[in-house]
Structures are given as C-alpha cells and as structure tokens.
C-alpha cells in the first residue's frame, strides 16, 4: 500500500480498503525500520495517530475532507508547527516550540493530512547535502537499494560509502523515497527541493514565487524562499499544490489568484510545445551520463513532434556569484533576530550584553551559518554596498530579463539538468567546503529562484552505478499547471524504476504490491 500513489491511496481510503490508522501505523513502522537514514528529527507519533483516528471517524461518517484526508505527510524542520519542536537543525533553536502553524502546514492539516514528523536538513537550510545540521547527516535511501548494490558491486555489509541525499531538504526527500510518507514539504531558495529530489529519485517541485505562502517558513532569503513539494510522482505534486496555492493575508508577497487545480490532464499534445535547451548549461563539469540523458530527453520531445531549439541565457555565467552576494546579504539580515533574548538558545556568559550576544551566536550557529553572516555583513558595509549588493541586484534584473526574453520568443518550457552528477558518497562530498559545494550543486537551479519561476525535477533513469538522475523543467511565471502537465507527460515516457530497498523488500506487502519494476526508457549510451 505504501508504494502506491497518493491518489490511489486516497481512493483506497474512500473505498474502505485501508483505514487511516492502518496507513499511519504502517508508515510509523517504516520510519522506525529506516531510522538509519536519519531522515526525521522529530517523529510525531502521538499526533499522527490522533489525527488518523479523527480521519477514520470522518470516513465512517462519509465526510471525507478530500484527497489528502488520512494521507501521511512530513514537514521540513524549518516550518513552524504548533506544539512540535522546530529546530532548523540548529543549536540556536533546540527546544523551540512555535505557538502557531506555518500556513502551508495548516492547509495540509485542514485537509486531514497526517503529520508523521519533522525532517532533517542542513542548519537553517544553508547547504546542498543535508550534512551540516546538528542532528547529523541524512543518508540517501538508494545507498541501500538492490540496484546500487548490484551495479556498484557494493558489499551489503559495507556501510562506509553511503551516499548523500543532496540538500537542504534531504530529510524530506529521503522520507518520501523510503516510503515513510506520501508527500513532504521542503523549502527551495536556490535548489533545495529539486537537488535532493534528483539524488533520491523522486519529484521535487518549486512553485512560482508568490503562489504559495511563506508565512511560518523560517526565512533564509526572503526574496527567493518558497515552500517546495516532494512526492513520488507528478500527479501527487499537483494534488498537494492544489491545497497549498492561494493568497495568504499573512504573506504580502502571495498573489490574489485562484488556487491551482488539484490535478493535471492525463494526456497532452506535445507537438504544440516549444522546448528550449539553454546552451549555457552545457558546462564542462557536467557528467557524461547526465549530458547523455539530457540529449536523449530532448530527442524524446522532438520525436513526439515538439519543437526543440537551443536558446541563450547570456547572463548565466554571473548567476552563481550574484546569488551568493544576494543570498548572504539577506541571510545576515535575517539571522540578526537570533540574539538570545526573545527565543532560542541563550549563552550563560553574562559579562556584558555584547559578550552574551557574541557567545550566544558562537554557540548557537555552526561555522557555515556564521560564515554566511560574515560574508553578508561584508557586502552590506557602507563602503561595499554599491559595489556588491546594488550591482548584484542589477545583475539579477538582467538574469530575470534573460528568462523573460526566452519565454516571449515562443518557448513554453526549458529543459535542463538538475545536478552535475548523480549522488556522491559522503566521504567524498565533505572533502570540499560548504561554499564550494553549494556553488557547484546550485549551478542549474539558483537562477530560477532569482527569477521567481516554477521548476520541477523529474527522475529519468539510473546511472551506470544504479543511482537516480533527474532533469529539470522550467516554466513561465505562474504557469505552474502547464509545467506540471508537461512534467507528467515526460514522467510517463521515461518510466523511472521503483527503488528496491534491501531489508524492506522482504515485506513486500508493506511497500510494493508487486515486485515488478518498469524499465526506464532513457538509457545510457
């Protein structure tokens, strides 16, 4: 049952084939069995079981709240949750229990979703590996898959070369990929939903900026942050988006638009599409396997009658530097609120107020967070402001114009890689510092955040090592439904294989109703 889609399970709940409590208990059991992944910081077992009980009563009375009623979900631990600790994977917020729910969390609960827990991340979502939080790194479920073990010839007992999930929403990605929930909330500032989705073989969606409320999402970069959605298929993403989208009076950046439909069409006429391939994204660091799959995907669209053209986003080469300046500047501003006085950690140093401030931030933040604060403060210094921050804002405007020009030329959707490579082993990943890693991992994703566009990473095939590779589709602003419609068609063509988790496959009834795997249409050349 847990291997089915959200829509299928919703139908099963309505038909009485399974109860919300049974579903909840199965997910909780799987969370315990996969504890080694470190996907969850907090498991809200009592809360979820109580919610399941209430959902069960509604189903018995024929008063289901909708497709999400009784569906287990998880939430990244940088969204506020009433009565449940919200830490941002930081010592600064250990023990902090918010008095309110983030708008997106409340919307899920209002539709009857079951909150399984809060998922792991990089501290304050500053990272691309989900390795820098105080609760330890998240492990990629594909490390323990039959596909990876067989193709890479890894000894089943060798646990030293485990793989990262990507980040910073790695806990949410691992939770969905390991079947412990049907959907999870992530956040996306420069690729933090799409990156781990690509590495974990699931769908990661970043909505248009302003379509989904940010209220209750602990801010990193206000002008780029958006809540992200992680699911195992595009249709499930559309269902969740239909619940989350819409104006929120508590977030002035949300648009006054009707909520997006809760589903996308099953079929579409691809021949009417124009697909753009940005030439600047063909970088030397791109692995040959990802490059090959990108080319095959373009050929797939073309073979179905779509017009596929090369396009130019000329200011792409400046985007990473521009993103770094703007990101750290806003981080420095946002992190100023954590001073040890109002909430969160407070140092015991009491020599002076200044000494207490300094000690609190030294003890509460890790090196990565402190480093970004220092960088941001440097860019915002009076003597540097014009040369760095203002210039970066001007470059951002040019990057936005690049996308506008491409879409106004007739392009419907852009097709790009999501990441440079497949997931890498943790020991290899930590050889480089956080800033270098983030610059590499965000290369194809951060410009979308600066432009406020919708984007989705769709898993397309397994690498020669048996690991997932995802490709990214980028749409026009507020054309999220069209983007997901294209993504759903694309997903159907590539038929990405189901993960076979060793140790869980013995209990096939819990996860997969049949053990047959569909074969991927896109294969390595």
UniProtKB/Swiss-Prot annotation:
It catalyses: L-glutamyl-tRNA(Gln) + L-glutamine + ATP + H2O = L-glutaminyl-tRNA(Gln) + L-glutamate + ADP + phosphate + H(+). HAMAP family: GatA (MF_00120). Subunit of the heterotrimeric GatCAB amidotransferase (AdT) complex, composed of A (QRSL1), B (GATB) and C (GATC) subunits. Its main location: mitochondrion. Gene3D superfamilies: Amidase signature (AS) domain (3.90.1300.10). It is an enzyme of class 6 (ligase). Belongs to the amidase family. GatA subfamily. It holds the Pfam family Amidase. The keyword Cytoplasm does not apply. GO terms for biological process: glutaminyl-tRNAGln biosynthesis via transamidation; mitochondrial translation; regulation of protein stability. It is found in: Mitochondrion. Keywords: ATP-binding, Ligase, Mitochondrion, Nucleotide-binding, Protein biosynthesis. One of its GO terms (cellular component) is glutamyl-tRNA(Gln) amidotransferase complex. The active site is at residues 76, 168, 192. This is Glutamyl-tRNA(Gln) amidotransferase subunit A, mitochondrial.
């Amino acid at each position: 049952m847990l291997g089915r889609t959200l829509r299928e399970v919703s139908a099963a709940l309505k038909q009485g084939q399974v109860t919300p409590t049974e579903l909840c208990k199965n997910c909780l059991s799987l969370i315990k069995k996969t504890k080694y992944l470190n996907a969850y910081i907090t498991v809200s077992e009592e809360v979820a079981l109580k919610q399941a009980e209430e959902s069960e009563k509604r189903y018995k009375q024929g008063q289901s709240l909708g497709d999400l009623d009784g569906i287990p979900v998880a939430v990244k631990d940088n969204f506020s949750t009433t009565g449940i600790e919200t830490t941002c994977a930081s010592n600064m917020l250990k023990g902090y229990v918010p008095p309110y729910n983030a708008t997106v969390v409340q919307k899920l609960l209002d539709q009857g979703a079951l909150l399984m827990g809060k998922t792991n991340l990089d501290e304050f979502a500053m990272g691309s590996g989900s390795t820098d939080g105080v609760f330890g790194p998240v492990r990629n479920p594909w490390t323990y898959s039959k596909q990876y073990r067989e193709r890479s010839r890894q000894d089943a007992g060798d646990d030293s070369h485990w793989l990262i999930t990507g980040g910073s929403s790695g806990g949410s990605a691992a939770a969905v990929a390991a079947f412990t929930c049907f959907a999870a909330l992530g956040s996306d500032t420069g690729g933090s939903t799409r990156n781990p989705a690509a590495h974990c073989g699931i769908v990661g969606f970043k909505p248009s900026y302003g379509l989904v409320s940010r209220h209750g999402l602990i801010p990193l970069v206000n002008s780029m942050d958006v809540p992200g959605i992680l699911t195992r298929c595009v249709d499930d993403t559309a269902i969740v988006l239909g619940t989350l989208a819409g104006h929120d009076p508590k977030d002035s950046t949300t648009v006054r638009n009707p909520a997006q439909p809760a589903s996308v069409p099953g079929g579409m006429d691809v021949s009417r599409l124009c697909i753009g391939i940005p030439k600047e994204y063909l970088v030397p660091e791109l692995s040959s396997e990802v490059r090959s799959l990108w080319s095959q995907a373009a050929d797939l669209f073309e073979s179905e009658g779509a017009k596929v053209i090369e396009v130019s986003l000329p200011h792409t080469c400046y985007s990473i530097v521009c993103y770094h300046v703007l990101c750290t500047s806003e981080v420095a501003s946002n992190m100023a609120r954590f001073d040890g006085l109002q909430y969160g950690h407070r140092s015991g140093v009491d020599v002076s107020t200044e000494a207490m401030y300094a000690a609190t931030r030294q003890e509460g933040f890790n090196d990565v967070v402190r480093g970004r604060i220092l960088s941001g403060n440097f860019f915002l210094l009076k003597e540097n402001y014009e040369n760095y921050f203002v210039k970066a804002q001007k470059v951002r405007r040019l990057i936005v114009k690049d996308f506008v020009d491409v879409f106004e030329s007739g392009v419907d959707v852009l097709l790009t890689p999501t990441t440079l490579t497949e997931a890498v082993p943790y020991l290899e990943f930590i050889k480089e510092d956080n800033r270098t890693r983030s610059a590499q991992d965000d290369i194809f994703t951060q410009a979308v955040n600066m432009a406020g566009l919708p984007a989705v990473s769709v898993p397309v095939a397994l690498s020669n090592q048996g690991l997932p590779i995802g490709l990214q589709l980028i749409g026009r602003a507020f054309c999220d439904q069209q983007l997901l419609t294209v993504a759903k068609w694309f997903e159907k063509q590539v038929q990405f294989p189901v993960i076979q988790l060793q140790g869980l496959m013995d209990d096939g009834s819990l996860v997969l109703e049949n053990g047959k795997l569909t074969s991927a249409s896109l294969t390595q050349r």
